[in-house]
UniProtKB/Swiss-Prot annotation:
GO MF terms held by the record: histidine-tRNA ligase activity
rRNA-binding in keyword set: no
Subunit structure: Heteromultimer composed of HisG and HisZ subunits.
Keywords: Amino-acid biosynthesis, Cytoplasm, Histidine biosynthesis
Subcellular locations according to the entry: Cytoplasm
Domain of life (superkingdom): Bacteria
InterPro entries tied to this protein: aa-tRNA-synth_II/BPL/LPL, HisRS-like_core, HisRS/HisZ, HisZ
Other comments on record: This function is generally fulfilled by the C-terminal part of HisG, which is missing in some bacteria such as this one.
Family the entry assigns: Belongs to the class-II aminoacyl-tRNA synthetase family. HisZ subfamily.
Protein name: ATP phosphoribosyltransferase regulatory subunit
């Protein structure tokens, strides 16, 4: 039996009902971003590998599919994340002074799925602010992320916050940590305290105690006060906790948790990191944070903060109903009918003309009206 219809693992077609909802949410979110002053950019699907991975962490390299350009012989990559591309556009192509707000929407491709059931072809949409180092930019980005989730009909949202500066300060005096860095991050992210105890044997006691405490520093905003009492009283850690406290009180329309061991994207971020969750689901639905160092690789270090989400994931969770109202028209050679259909379509109506010999209903549309011939010509009436 032929299996030419099979697709690669974790790759799937988007069928009409899902595509309809994804497109509706994409339009809603891009329209929302525009009301905040964000400009749409469309980076290419593939770039030379050195450009695509510049300023990013090792994780992105592993997720990037590589191929050889038959024109130049150079290695290219299919993008696994649009955010570094937008940073390149801001730093190298636009090169504007002051604040720049950019947004994007497009497919990305992962060499490996992020999870057991995760797609390898997410549809990523997001927004970025460049040029402002203050917390005002982070507050705006978090507001925009929550507004985007609200536009998708998601409620009971929780934001988990962390700060890359805390771990950076703890590891600053431990150059030998690079040998166990990946294992250390994995243990912190999974809150595997026994593994942490084993990995931190031989470290200075102050840093070891702090690293072992990070997985326990999870919960409400009061965690910030617990962290001040538990972690070393360094200026860098104090600033990071101050920023988390200042951001937490500004969140509207969501509850706030602090999770000081949620370090996904640590190599990429330079400050506050945050993720949005909805009730009953273990995985985040949107994620973002500050990444001031990315543009430096393109010759222009700029403060930057942003967020992104996967439209396919959000559409699967969204209660939004998208079934367009349409007008049913018979097939007839009457020029007046063709003129009536053209006029309705020009006015933005969906008109579906029945082809000869077919009487089935289309589940894609709700044909609640129909065109019928009357004495005065063709008219729209309830169906």
């Amino acid at each position: 039996m032929s299996n030419h219809w099979l697709l690669p693992e974790n790759i799937a077609d988007v069928l009409p009902s899902e595509a309809r909802k994804i497109e509706e949410l994409r339009r809603r979110m891009l329209d929302l971003f525009r009301t905040y002053g964000y400009e749409l950019v469309m980076p290419p699907m593939l770039e030379y590998l050195e450009s695509l991975l510049t300023g990013t962490g090792h994780d992105l390299d592993l997720r990037t599919l590589k191929l050889v350009d038959q024109l130049s012989g150079r290695t290219m990559g299919l993008r696994a994340d649009i955010t570094p591309q937008v940073a390149r556009i801001d730093a190298h192509l636009l090169n504007r002074p002051g604040v720049t707000r950019l947004c994007y929407a497009g497919n990305v491709l992962h060499a490996r799925p992020a999870g057991f059931h995760a797609t390898r072809e997410p549809i990523q949409i997001g927004a970025e602010i460049y040029g402002h180092a203050g917390l005002e930019a982070d507050i705006e980005i978090q507001d925009l992320m929550l507004a985007a989730l609200q536009a998708a009909g998601l409620s009971d949202v929780r934001i988990d916050m962390c700060h890359a500066g805390i771990l950076e300060a703890l590891l600053a005096g431990l150059p030998s940590i690079r040998k166990i860095e990946d294992a250390l991050f994995a243990a912190l992210e999974t809150k595997d305290v026994p593994a942490l105890r084993e990995l931190t044997v031989g470290m200075p006691q102050t840093e070891r105690d702090a690293l072992l405490a990070l997985p326990t520093l999870y919960g409400g905003v009061d965690v910030i006060d617990r962290a001040r009492a538990t972690l070393p009283a360094s200026p860098a850690i104090g600033r990071a906790l101050d920023e988390l406290a200042a951001l937490a009180v500004q969140v509207r329309g969501a509850s706030v948790n602090i999770d000081l061991s949620d370090l996904r994207g640590y190599h990429y971020h330079s400050g506050v990191m945050f993720a949005a969750y909805v009730a009953g689901l273990p995985n985040y639905v949107a994620r973002g944070g500050r990444y001031d160092k990315v543009g430096e690789a393109f010759g222009r270090a700029r403060p930057a903060t942003g967020f992104s989400l996967d439209l396919r994931e959000v559409a699967a969770l969204s209660p939004v109903e998208v079934r367009a109202q349409a007008i049913f028209a018979p097939w007839d050679a009457d020029p007046a009918l063709r003129a009536a259909i053209s006029a309705l379509r020009a006015a933005g109506e969906i008109v579906i003309q029945s082809l000869p010999g077919h009487t089935h209903e289309l589940d894609e549309f709700n044909c609640d009206r129909q065109l019928v011939r009357q004495d005065a010509g063709w008219a729209v009436v309830p169906r």
